[in-house]
Amino acid sequence: MAKKSSVAREAKRRRLVEANFKKRSDLRKIVKSLSVSEEEKENARISLNKMKRDTSPTRLHNRCLLTGRPRGYLRKFAISRICFRQMASMGEIPGVIKASW
């Protein structure tokens, strides 16, 4: 199990990213736009730099829903490889069977 503080920190980051996604994407569009004046671009850059770092989606890290483990994460199931193996062997994941050939 991951520390509860690590899981809570990641959840807080996800909330911040979701809340500020629109504003951040609008500012990035202004910075990348060719039709906007340099002064407006500079103001957009300054606004982006003033935003909290945790509002950036780059800082998010996928974690297992059951244990909070940050490594060995399977995107399709949103759990770690260890939990996946346990659940698959117990038949708790529909459609997943052990391979045999």
From Swiss-Prot:
This protein's record includes keyword DNA-binding: no
Assembly notes: Part of the 30S ribosomal subunit. Contacts proteins S3 and S10.
Key words of the record: Ribonucleoprotein, Ribosomal protein, RNA-binding, rRNA-binding
One of the Pfam families matching this protein, by short name: Ribosomal_S14
Highest taxon listed in the record's lineage: Bacteria
Transport in keyword set: no
UniProt-listed NCBIfam families: PRK08881.1
Stored InterPro entries: Ribosomal_uS14 (IPR001209), Ribosomal_uS14_bac/plastid (IPR023036), Ribosomal_uS14_CS (IPR018271)
Any GO molecular function: structural constituent of ribosome
Family: Belongs to the universal ribosomal protein uS14 family.
One of the protein's GO biological processes: translation
GO CC, alphabetical: cytoplasm; small ribosomal subunit
Name of the protein in its database record: Small ribosomal subunit protein uS14
